[in-house]
Amino acid sequence: MSQDNATAPTSNFLRQIIDADLAQGTYADRKDATGQPIPPVVTRFPPEPNGYLHIGHAKSIWVNFGMARDYNGRCHLRFDDTNPVKEDTEYVDSIIDAVHWLGYSWSDAGGEHLYYASDYFEQLYGFAEVLIQRGVAYVDSQSAEQIAANRGDFTRPGTLSPFRDRSVDENLALFRDMRAGKYKDGEHVLRAKIDMAAPNIVMRDPVLYRIRHAHHHRTGDAWCIYPMYDFTHCISDALENITHSLCTLEFENNRPLYDWVLDHLRDAGVLAAPLPHQYEFARLHLTYAITSKRKLLQLVTEKRVDGWDDPRMPTLVGIRRRGYTPESIQLFCERVGVSKADSWIDMSILEGAVRDDLDARAPRSVAVLDPVKLVLDNVPADFNEPCSAPVHPKQPELGRREFPLTRELWIEREDFTETPPKGYFRLFPGNKVRLRYGYVIECTGCDKDAAGNITAVHANIIPDTKSGTPGADSVKVKGNIHWVSAAHALEAEVRLYDRLFSDPQPDSGDKNFLDALNPNSKKIVKAFLEPTLATAKAEDRFQFERHGYFVADRIDSQPGKPVFNRVVGLKDSWGK
């Protein structure tokens, strides 16, 4: 989002940390290798390109890019592409597109700040040799299963590897042979030599490098050993002059290893202070949604949804296709805020953000989603009277839209009943209602087919009651229904999306998340729309009066033949 559209930032513990660093000049007066000044606040967003970003990533993007923006710093986009088996350029492209869609940029006066961890493979390898030479890293020849079994748990310490005391020369020779491709996958790993009795299991001689004979999306087959995330991440931060490495709470236990690697490399003289520091904030737990990549992939592969960009998915491509705006995502993040404690955020907050955003900007229109014909019997067959309504009731400068009132109309099936319940003010025989922006009418009856289904409703116009005329209030009515001209309406496909899950925490505990799928999360209807919608372009958003907010589908919608997705209803239908 542009800074012009950003609201005043709310104070939180991350801002307090940054404010203190600025006051102390922790990262002041730095210059890069070319002599260019480095801002005192440099953050980064480092996704692994092994899937599509989801709403949880949006919060991390907002935090990292937003902090950099608010402090006139910069934020880097860095791909943590150290696992060639799971990564693909498809995901790289989708992540770049998603961050751009959210309105953020990684460019500044110093150029583009788009990076890949694979850019640093040679340097990372060199740093690994430095740790070996300092006697704090060793090649372990145990199997992955043995390493896991010997790591211990929270009740017992780990067991030292029988290969832990190899000499520096032997470790260097083995590590270089690993790089040269002389060993099979899993035959050796490089581990840090820290403390196998550490209370924090992360610090029990973590693996730094593993052998993986796999094609990398950028480096091809140049490498057959790849660094682990914990080794790569902190060094990449240091090489890019990151100041504040902001990540979610699941990495809290990894922070000591982050510091351990950087401290050893600083002491070896290959990295210089001031070094970056990692800080953790609460990740986003959204009700009625899942964000596990494995489970999202299962939904896609089992065809429980229509792909990664299914509008019911929590992926950013799905949320975008649903009709959410970048501004609504930012508003949602602002309302959720930044804290140190994990908590569940109700889906209604996300829906409320897009509802508030679109209420302020979306043009109004009319759509009949479950149509039944209404015949006005006391006007001629060629009756055609122009009606108009504001494009937006709070923005008169946008003008008015015009549409015809004719003898035959489409109305919502639920707006007529033969036997009205108490409090029903819409059409039933003998009752009067107003046709929105048109006349007051009185219902006279209905037609049915042989099965008893209502095929048409009949009514008479009450003259001199048209909206906007002196006689508009001459007949008092309680009901007001919307309509479109049967002769002029635009027929279109409308997809009524709802929450994908009916359980607020579908994968908590030992639940099978598939059991919580909402069978009513998608309904496709043939609707009749106000004819002005024929010119709707992909991603144009509207309020369909009395129904909610809708968007022209960015993939399937065509000029003159739009397809609309429901973004959100006018009110929260899930509230207790």
From Swiss-Prot:
Its EC number is 6.1.1.18. The keyword Nucleotide-binding applies. A motif ('KMSKS' region) lies at residues 290-294. L-glutamine binds at residues 80, 229. A motif ('HIGH' region) lies at residues 47-57. Keywords: Aminoacyl-tRNA synthetase, ATP-binding, Cytoplasm, Ligase, Nucleotide-binding, Protein biosynthesis. Gene3D superfamilies: HUPs, Ribosomal Protein L25, Chain P. InterPro entries: aa-tRNA-synth_I_CS, Gln-tRNA-synth, Gln/Glu-tRNA_Ligase, Gln_tRNA_ligase_bac, Glu/Gln-tRNA-synth, Glu/Gln-tRNA-synth_Ib_cat-dom, Glu/Gln-tRNA-synth_Ib_codon-bd, Rbsml_bL25/Gln-tRNA_synth_N. ATP binds at residues 48-50, 54-60, 248, 283-284. One of its GO terms (biological process) is glutamyl-tRNA aminoacylation. GO terms for cellular component: cytosol. It holds the Pfam family tRNA-synt_1c_C. GO terms for molecular function: ATP binding; glutamine-tRNA ligase activity. CDD domains: GlnRS_core (cd00807). Monomer. Belongs to the class-I aminoacyl-tRNA synthetase family. This is Glutamine--tRNA ligase. It comes from Ralstonia pickettii (strain 12J). The gene is glnS.
